[in-house]
């Protein structure tokens, strides 16, 4: 980053030869700075032998830093989650003093409960997203934990059987959610298309240079998103069900699309036949009822 205040690994201890080698092997492709309230946020697109990724750093007023690392595919999911949080935040009315007091954890004004929560698990990383509120206002807390060995989630604290690294947390003021999401989306659009994790690298995705565009459908209060992607295992379809209160998704490998399509078509035809039989029975009952009324006359 040009101004030296990036979320990248600069300005710390030298770390010796290994640190120098990591710096040489990792290339910074782009950087974006956001100033939100009294905080600075840096979004750095980087690339190494494993592919492209985004490092997000929060720099507080005192110069303290917190960092998150997202693969490009996880960053794309984060972008979508941020859209959900933006929508939820927009629906919230102004807080009353009583609501703020209830959502605070005590005399220190710390947040006690979340207004909305989501979590994401990808490979050895877990991400927790919580929209919270305290005396200073509403904010999105994003926490990342990393599995460093066996026993992920057991034992904790890096003790025997516990392989969880101390988590990193950033707190994004709610007023900056849209600006942050848009900046992240721009970096993904500009640098995510050639990421090996998204394209699957040479030979993956069957060698296709392009994939079908994503789409969505609205059914009652639910929206279903269909997104085609690829990784080192091949092409897949991610189907996400999104409601105001939750989000769920499944991933279907390309080789199973035909089977899924056949199953959907079969069930659609069977339900159509069931509905027609049900409708015919209703007509028959109505005709019988009308016939009985005529006989009574």
From Swiss-Prot:
DNA-binding: region residues: 23-246
Residues with the N-acetylalanine modification: 2
Pfam families the UniProt entry points to: PurA
Origin superkingdom: Eukaryota
GO cellular component term of the entry, any: nucleus
Region of interest (Disordered), ranges: 1-26, 275-297
Compositional bias ranges of the Basic and acidic residues kind: 275-288
Subcellular localization, as worded in the UniProt entry: Nucleus
Keywords associated with the record: Acetylation, Activator, DNA-binding, Nucleus, Repressor, Transcription, Transcription regulation
GO aspect biological process, one term: regulation of transcription by RNA polymerase II
Gene Ontology MF, one: DNA-binding transcription repressor activity, RNA polymerase II-specific
Function: Transcriptional regulator which can act as an activator or a repressor.
Family: Belongs to the PUR DNA-binding protein family.
Name used for this protein in its record: Transcriptional regulator protein Pur-beta
Gene (name only): purb
């Amino acid at each position: 980053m040009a101004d030296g205040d990036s979320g990248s690994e600069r300005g710390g201890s030298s770390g010796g030869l290994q640190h120098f080698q990591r710096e040489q092997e990792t290339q910074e492709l782009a950087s974006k700075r956001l100033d939100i309230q009294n905080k600075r946020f840096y979004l750095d697109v980087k690339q190494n032998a494993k592919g492209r990724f985004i490092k997000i750093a929060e720099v507080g007023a005192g110069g303290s830093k917190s960092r998150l690392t997202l693969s490009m595919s996880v960053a794309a999911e984060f972008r979508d989650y941020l859209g959900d949080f933006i929508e939820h935040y927009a629906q919230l009315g102004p807080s009353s003093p009583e609501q703020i007091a209830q959502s605070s954890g005590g005399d220190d004004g710390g947040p006690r409960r979340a207004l909305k929560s989501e979590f994401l698990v990808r490979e050895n990383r877990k991400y927790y997203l919580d929209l919270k509120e305290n005396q200073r206002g509403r904010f999105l807390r994003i926490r990342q934990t990393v599995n460093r060995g066996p026993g992920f989630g057991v034992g904790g604290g890096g003790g025997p059987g516990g392989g969880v690294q101390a988590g990193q947390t950033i707190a994004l003021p709610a007023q900056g959610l849209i600006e942050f999401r848009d900046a992240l989306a721009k970096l993904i659009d500009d640098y995510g298309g050639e990421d090996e994790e998204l394209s699957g690298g040479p030979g993956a995705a069957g060698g296709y240079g392009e994939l079908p565009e994503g789409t969505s459908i609205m059914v009652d209060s639910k929206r279903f998103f269909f997104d085609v992607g690829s990784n080192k295992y091949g092409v897949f379809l991610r189907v996400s069900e999104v409601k105001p209160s939750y989000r769920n998704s499944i991933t279907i490998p390309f080789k199973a699309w035909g089977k899924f399509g056949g199953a959907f078509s079969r069930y659609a035809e069977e339900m159509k036949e069931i509905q027609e039989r049900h409708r015919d029975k209703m007509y028959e009952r109505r005709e019988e009822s009308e016939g009985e009324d005529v006989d009574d006359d």
